[in-house]
């Protein structure tokens, strides 16, 4: 953990590349050289996107907790309002990654389904979260006004044609995507 893990990871990658170039077994043929260069560029690009580009985008589009609503049982709904931007559009049944404490660069987000209507014009987003672990036990203590970061939307558990008849069966906290479908 911490900077030691990042430094060790970078050193391991450098050692692997030096070994690969030094042994030359994987770089003898032009197609092998092209393959390894392409794979290296792809993975470095993906790493830069996940660790730098995506968090920068999230940092520029924060949300503020507008309401912390206690629900039945050990369940809490976080109502979040876009802070200085219009928010994002999602479809009922989708989810997002929520980062409450800390920077989006730490990649400490947790996935939760949206429970609010996807048709909300003001960009408000609700997530209904049940206390099931270390992170979720702190959700009821989140202060109103707290800056949070959302990454999403993700997922394909959506209703195709809303005019069609649908039967939705769910129980427990698994009902949250259906709440969004019903509210939309």
Task: Please describe what each predicted stretch is.
Residues 53, 57-149, 166:
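Ferredoxin-reductase
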Residues 1-56, 126, 131-184:
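FNR/FR-type flavoprotein reductase catalytic core
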